Amino acid sequence: MNEIPYERVKIARDNGRPTGTDYIKNIFKNFIEFHGDRCYADDKAIVGGIARLNGMPVTVIAIEKGHTAKERSYRNFGAPHPEGYRKALRLMKQAEKFGRPIVCFIDTSGAYCGVEAEERGQGQAIARNILEMTTLCVPVISILIGEGGSGGALALAVADRVWMLENAVYSVISPEGCASILWKDAKKAGEAAASLKLMAEDAKSLGVIERILSENEIGKKEFYDRIGRLIKEELDELSRDTELVGKRYDRF
């Protein structure tokens, strides 16, 4: 049994899995990307903008890893800098101003931990997102599509509904990092993965997420159509809820 959680981690990290921009391209129409945080730069690890979902205007934000080595390098392997989180927050506040629901796709091993990111306020940027997301007056759905690593994932996951693909993972630390800290041996990553309760089934049983999304036909039109339909149905329901902020605040 201990082998199963770590196998899920390997699947979640697979280069062939659909990335954030794949979901944007195949689920939404008329996507217009916005760039920059208006403070420092444009972080390529986070893609965001406005689009339409079956005619509904939405703001969509995704942490993007890329598929090829060149794409992954360009996207910093899906590890956002502070300016990425600030860009995401700028888009969220804009969505709130214009009454647009927000959809986030999360796939990151964690926020970038380089010295330059720390100098530009990585911790503050993540904390600010978490704080501001609790008070957004529009519906928010966050979907973990691959890796959900620590605060780097949580900074886009303070939502009314949090979903996971069945082979996605969500954890405070990577199995390798946990094994290195607890046992000084990264080779015990499998044992660490089992202890971390990082699978979608674990997250649902603990009340961290509401729904596990089947990966049947993943990457095909039928898969994206199904995910898009579920998002639209949920947004329609959430849009009728007059107590979103209070419920979200109580949850987190």
Predicted regions and their residues:
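Terminal-region recognition feature
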Residues: M1-S180, K184-K187, A194-R251
